[in-house]
């Protein structure tokens, strides 16, 4: 209800949602099916008895959609993906500044490197757990300054999604989504708040027929996924 009141009171511009489909590569399909089979076997054997264990399997499936996999031993395995090229295509379709949210550190670094290669080193800043505290405010100020060449704010929603104002952007791209509804809502509001005079366009990158689609569907329906995955729905999430 407070969200409705916010719009009523502040008369903020509209939010527009766009979904961009990204097909999996054959390598991703193979790895995804293996991981899904493993997750369902663990479910059958009773290994996935906690919310955390189910969310870990969901996270691994999502990582594969993004083009990498980080198993328990921590060694990141990369897999050929179309997602980065799709993102670069999107950046050619709009003018002005943009926020790009990504759940995984590996993706933040890959996205930032690709954008720097295309648009120059001054055009990109990253904002996530490893960003030094004393640099964070300057990044926000530079981004908000229309004369500053910083065009792309590439961040992790759980780090940059709260409390900061990024109204210089009216394009927000979700390279990957958090399964935490509150993090999604808060990260949307970095651009959509007092000071925003333009409509804000939210673009979600989604691999059809995968966990991506289920996560986005739940978020759009304002469902907190962590509260959903342990009941009878758990098989649906992993199928």
Question: Model-derived features: where do they sit?
Answer:
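A conserved SF2-helicase RecA2
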Residues: 179-239
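Helix N-cap/beta->alpha junction signal
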Residues: 80, 103-106
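Alpha-helical elements of the RecA-like P-loop NTPase motor core of helicases
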Residues: 30, 85, 109, 113, ...
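Conserved helicase ATPase core of P-loop NTP-dependent helicases/translocases
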Residues: 99-101, 109-110, 119-160
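Inter-lobe coupling linker of SF2 helicases/translocases
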Residues: 1-76, 80-96, 202, 219-221
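Short glycine-/polar-rich loops that comprise or flank the Walker A/P-loop
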Residues: 15-17, 120-123, 167-171, 196-202
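Conserved nucleotide-binding/hydrolysis micro-motifs of P-loop NTPases
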Residues: 26-29, 105-107, 132, 159-161, ...
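SF2 helicase motor core recognition
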Residues: 7, 108-112, 151-176, 180-199
């Amino acid at each position: 209800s407070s969200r409705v009141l916010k719009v009523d009171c502040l008369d903020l511009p509209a939010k527009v949602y766009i979904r961009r489909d990204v097909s999996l590569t054959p390598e991703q399909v193979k790895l995804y099916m293996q991981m899904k089979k493993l997750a369902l076997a663990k479910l059958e054997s009773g290994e996935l008895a906690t919310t955390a264990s189910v969310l870990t399997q969901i996270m691994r499936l999502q990582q594969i959609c993004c083009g990498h996999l980080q198993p328990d031993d921590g060694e990141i395995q990369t897999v050929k993906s179309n997602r980065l090229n799709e993102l670069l295509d999107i950046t050619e379709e709009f003018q002005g500044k943009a926020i790009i949210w990504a759940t995984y550190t590996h993706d933040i670094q890959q996205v930032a490197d690709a954008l720097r290669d295309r648009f120059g080193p001054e055009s990109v800043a990253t904002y996530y757990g490893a960003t030094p505290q004393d640099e964070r405010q300057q990044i926000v100020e530079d981004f908000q300054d229309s004369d500053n060449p910083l065009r792309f704010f590439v961040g992790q929603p759980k780090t940059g999604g709260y409390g900061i104002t990024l109204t210089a952007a009216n394009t927000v791209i979700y390279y990957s989504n958090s399964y935490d509804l509150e993090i999604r809502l808060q990260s949307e509001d970095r651009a959509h708040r007092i000071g925003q005079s333009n409509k804000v366009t939210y673009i979600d990158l989604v691999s059809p027929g995968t966990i991506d689609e289920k996560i986005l569907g739940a978020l759009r329906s304002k469902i907190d996924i962590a509260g959903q995955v342990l009941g009878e729905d758990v098989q649906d999430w992993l199928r």
